[in-house]
Amino acid sequence: EEGLPSPAQRLPEPLQRIRQETGIRPLINGGVVIKYNANQKYTTDAVSAAVFGEICRRAGVPVQRYANRPDIPGGSTLGNISCAHVAIDCVDVGLAQLAMHSAYETAGARDTAYLCRAAEAFYASAIRRDGEKIRLETEK
């Protein structure tokens, strides 16, 4: 089984850049964001990120990566709580946004199209595990 939780990804506010991991900065209209957290507040791991990244590559969808600084608490998703009760591989993805949860929330129109295309490709894919091997079959 596979899961695709899809919360939004807050972009660092100009005055709060200290909260993001150095060198990782998603951009609006830069593609779908794969979210990582060293304290496991997101479900993404190396395998799920690699599989989802390959699905996106085959679908022509750009991918960005984001990680919170592990020493500063940030948001989380329900995905990691759900995965604790059901054995499925999951990857947390979203769209880069400014002013999340405000009346002026802003995201890119291209990113919305990218996420739709990524979700279509994900649900049209067959991900098979055989021991340590993973086989990915996607519709052409």
Task: Please provide the spans of the model-predicted regions.
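Active-site-adjacent substrate-binding region
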Residues: 4, 8-102, 130
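His/Asp/Glu-rich mid-to-C-terminal helical/loop segments that flank catalytic regions of hydrolases
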Residues: 95-140
